[in-house]
Amino acid sequence: MMACGLSKSLGLSSSLKKQQGIVSILGGISSNTSSAPSLRRTFSADLSSKTWVSQNGFSPMKRISSSEKLRPDEEEAEEESRSGVDIWAQIQQDKNDKKKEEEIEPGQSDVWSSILSEKKKTESSKDTVPPPYVHPLMKRASSLSEKSLEICTESLGSETGCDGFSSHASSETGDAEIEIHDETNLVVNVTETKVEEITETEIVVEQESSIIVPNHIIELPPGSFPPPIRSLSSQSGSSLHMKTRRDNGRLVLEAVSMPSHNNFSAKRQDGRLLLTFAEISNEPNYDKEDEIDSEVQWFDEEEEEEEEEEDEEEEAPDEFAYKPNGLLYKMAQKPIPITVHRLAHKPIGVPKRNSRWPMADEFDTKSDLSTPVVHSLPPRPRVAQLARSTKPPSTVDDTVGAACFNTCDYSWKSTNTESFGPNTKTQFQAQNFVNKSMGDGWINGCKDRRRSLLSVEPFCIAT
């Protein structure tokens, strides 16, 4: 009994103590212990909700400065947790994207990688500058010997850099004297095939053997071919000219000495190029006997040609021939073959315009010496002389014809030997010869209309 009383008293005292502590914290509450909730239940509830506190009979909590400070700290922690979650989600998304890229076909990835690599190569090549272009002749010039370089400056007087035809061209000697110290050996792989016959099958065995070929320069013998130009000159003044001729289907080259055409000579003095006037002392001396022989041969050819022309003239028929009517005509000459020698020795001069007029020697032989040679139209006859020589006109037609006299008709009129004396026959023959020979030149003038004798100007003029 005593124990039960003690436990009850202890329970009451503890409850009172607890109530005292809760009352001091939460405020005034009812003295009924059954209505008050337990401490475990109160702490597990959401203290932040005001509805629960009001339903259970608790007064709202009083905020102090410490609780106000704790609220923004909680908000910052929530923001940090959210930012951490966002970062983690982003990392997971990146991993998923990489997995998707790896799941793409490998062929496409290879193409893309090759494109990227080529792009990188092109960019790198643009950055690097290509090496400068060097002409092959410039490369070869770097390996020339000192002598060949001296020839370029010392022997500028001649075209090839040599003093005469006996000496060889500079290009030949310079190339032959090139010395290469770094001689390399070339290794050539030669495949030798050997066929071995074994019973019924053929087996081809290839064996590779290395053959060492020394790299050396083959020197050409001097003067193996003629110089590349047609003439060679020297400082002495004389020069050589390459003359070509054909002999039995072969090309023959001959060196002929010719006078020099160089006006300047080049010398090297104290490292400078000195140009001076060339003094040509060795002039070509021609033999007088050769000149005399050539002149005699030329005169002999001229005499032979003259003799041939004389023989042709003797064999040819007379140029003049008489016809039955008493007129004198000139026969056409036969064409004589013209040779090259005649054309060469033919004298050059002003040719005669009137080629059809006869020469004076021909008239001397064929006609009287008293008759003058006519080189133009016959003089116009006077009216009084014509009136005496002709009979008086009997009809009207004769009077009209006498009034309208034309010189062209007169020149073409046949000769009347009865009215004139016998001494005038040769004169009219000569005039008729002239009229017949020069009739072609008067055709244009004779076609004009007849004019009266009152016109003083001569109409038909030979030009």
Curated annotation (Swiss-Prot):
Task: Write out the GO MF terms.
Answer: phosphatase binding
This entry carries the following GO cellular component terms, namely: chloroplast; cytoplasm; endoplasmic reticulum; nucleus
Segments for region (Disordered) = 57-135, 298-320
Q: What is its main location?
A: plastid
Where composition is biased (Basic and acidic residues), the residues are 117-126
Key words, A-Z? Chloroplast, Plastid, Transit peptide
* Compositionally biased intervals (Acidic residues): 298-318
FT transit peptide: 1-44
Q: Name one GO biological process term.
A: negative regulation of abscisic acid-activated signaling pathway
Keyword Nucleotide-binding belongs to the record: no
Q: Where found?
A: Plastid, Chloroplast
Against Pfam families, the record matches this protein to: FAF
User: Residue ranges of the FAF domain?
Assistant: 224-278
Q: What PANTHER family does this protein map onto?
A: FANTASTIC FOUR-LIKE PROTEIN (DUF3049) (PTHR33155), PROTEIN FAF-LIKE, CHLOROPLASTIC (PTHR33155:SF3)
Similarity-based family: Belongs to the fantastic four family.
Listed name of the protein: Protein FAF-like, chloroplastic
Q: State the species of origin.
A: Arabidopsis thaliana
Q: What is the lineage of its organism?
A: Eukaryota, Viridiplantae, Streptophyta, Embryophyta, Tracheophyta
